[in-house]
Design a protein with these regions (language model features):
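Short strand-connecting beta-turns/loops that link adjacent beta-strands
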Residues: 152, 188-189
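A short hydrophobic beta-strand segment most commonly corresponding to one strand
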Residues: 142-147, 174, 189-204
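Fe(II)/2-oxoglutarate oxygenase catalytic core
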Residues: 1-120, 124-134, 191, 205-254
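A short beta-strand-loop-beta hairpin characteristic of the jelly-roll/cupin
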Residues: 148-169
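Short, conserved beta-strand element in jelly-roll/cupin
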Residues: 123-125, 136-152
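Short beta-strand His + acidic residue motifs that chelate non-heme Fe in jelly-roll/DSBH
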Residues: 130-133, 175, 181-187
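Conserved metal-binding segment of the jelly-roll/cupin
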Residues: 165-180
């Protein structure tokens, strides 16, 4: 069977499943969720400056950070340059140990969030545009906490469906990424958010089914490959740091 036909059948099946799932969602089929309904969002907002401090330390070596498609290769359909950098703490439940060690306060905060599966710093360069796309599965909610927002905030925006939002430092937005969404940073400053995927709550029995499906996805080839790519980057980074450290020590002895 041709791959395109398999993809079409798979996509249609997912759409059918999602239409059933949303009937069991206490939040309905919305574009944006009300963050006030999730107490953990306030905890993040109240501690955003501590998160920002750890981010600033990470950004001191910005050029060494991996591009999104270097970690998650399927992202090449929406980005193929070096204008969207990432710093992963968690990816679909897989912990990036050395990165988490560099950001202990942020890690502790995200680990306290019920259903947290993915957490990373999403770093958009000035002028970066992410074309319209949709997420693969309705079983998670996408959350962004504004950490570095350009002064011309009106020119840095996200569209979900037919609604537009702007990020604010220290404030979060949460949306259903299975609705078509698009991002523009039409400014001369970078935009950074703490990017989270959270297991979406559903009434029984769909909640248990959803958690099972997410566990299966976490073992899929594309997630496994992304985990391998992340581990390779961490190893290269550690080796580079060790080499630089040794060079500095040697220079000090001269």
């Amino acid at each position: 069977m041709p791959k395109s036909l398999v993809d079409t059948i798979g996509f249609q099946l997912i759409q059918l499943i999602e239409r059933v799932m949303v009937r069991y969602s206490p939040h309905g089929d919305v574009l944006f969720f009300d963050t006030d309904e999730f107490p953990w969002t306030k905890t993040l907002e109240n501690n955003w400056e501590e998160i920002r401090n750890e981010l600033d330390a990470v950004l001191e070596n910005r050029s060494a950070l991996p591009n999104f498609q270097d970690i998650s290769e399927d992202q090449t359909s929406i980005t193929d340059d070096d204008q969207w950098k990432t710093f992963f703490l968690y990816g679909f439940g897989h912990k990036a140990e050395s990165n988490c060690a560099r950001c202990p306060k942020t890690t502790k905060l995200v680990e306290q969030i019920p259903g947290m599966k993915t957490a990373f710093f999403s770093i958009l360069a000035p002028g970066k545009h992410i074309p319209a796309h949709r997420g693969p599965y309705k079983g998670v909610m996408r959350y962004h906490l504004g950490l570095k927002v350009p002064q011309q905030a009106e020119n840095c925006r996200i569209r979900v469906g037919d609604e537009y939002r702007h990020w604010k430092e220290g404030k979060g937005i949460m949306f259903d990424d299975t609705h078509q969404h698009e991002v523009w940073n039409d400014t001369d400053e970078e935009r950074v958010v703490l990017f989270l995927d959270i297991v979406r709550p559903f009434d029984p029995p769909v909640g248990a089914i959803n958690r099972g499906l997410i566990k299966l996805i976490s073992m899929s080839p594309f997630v496994t490959k992304a985990k391998e790519n992340q581990e390779k980057w961490e190893k290269r980074h550690q080796q580079a740091q060790a080499t630089n450290g040794a060079a500095k020590v040697a220079a000090g002895k001269v």
